[in-house]
């Protein structure tokens, strides 16, 4: 799947949202690098958010703002910890999931957003996880297994 997405990036084909789940940093870093190098310096703005420290609203506000000096924006939303199983009230940051779910159905066409969940797995029972997976290209960043 990564090879297909990387090829699409190189051919100028981009979906509005990507979700990368998994602990293999090579695939995460390489996906971001290939996406970034698919544009020239003046064609794209790169903005990064840490969702363990910043609310989703920051990502959505940035995504809905038209790029000023470029054609597109790439937003990297790292550490999407709200996608994993946690006890209620244990999240450090409160996120507006209703707004997020509405935004997922109508994302900006000038922004490519990559949500990174660097965890072994996400909580498939959560509504927000289901919505994000339905409205994104999902990539599994797993360590390749040697098959003999």
Regions found by a protein language model. Give the residues of each.
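Conserved beta/loop motifs at nucleotide-recognition and modification sites
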Residues: 1-148
